[in-house]
């Protein structure tokens, strides 16, 4: 099979209702604001190591509208309660869980050893986006 598109990376774009509040939410998790654009800012990015997430206030993404394309109904309301799910791989889920509790971040699923050999937990962003935070478990002998 001939390779048509060789991807060099992928960056999700999350639709958010308040970009400044979202920067602050990610900073509670130890992510850094990488940049923002506009005056006032309506587009920006957060990063952790080599991972980056774009943030777009009330436009691009599965819950918003933009001048280019309506992505969810006339005003975005059809998907207002539906966020994006993303997996984030870390070294220690339990450490992240404790940190989230101290920061007031909503934990929707506590750290659990899953049958697919992964320990994971879920947190929810105020706009409904869910982050599945996981680390692999060692194979049992």
Tell me what each language-model feature is.
Residues 2-13, 29-91, 95-124, 135-141:
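Vicinal oxygen chelate
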Residues 18-33:
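Amphipathic alpha-helical segments
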């Amino acid at each position: 099979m001939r390779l048509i598109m060789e991807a060099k990376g992928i960056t999700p774009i999350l639709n958010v209702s308040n970009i400044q509040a979202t920067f602050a939410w990610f900073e509670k998790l130890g992510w850094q604001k990488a940049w923002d654009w506009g005056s006032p800012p309506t587009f920006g990015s957060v990063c952790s190591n080599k991972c980056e997430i774009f943030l777009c206030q009330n436009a691009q993404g599965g819950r918003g509208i933009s001048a280019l394309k309506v992505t969810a109904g006339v005003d975005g309301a059809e998907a207002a309660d539906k966020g994006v799910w993303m997996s984030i791989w870390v070294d220690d889920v339990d450490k992240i869980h404790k940190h989230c509790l101290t920061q007031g971040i909503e934990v929707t699923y506590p750290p659990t050893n899953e049958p697919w050999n992964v320990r994971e937990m879920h947190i929810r962003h105020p706009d409904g986006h869910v982050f599945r935070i996981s680390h692999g478990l060692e194979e049992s002998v």
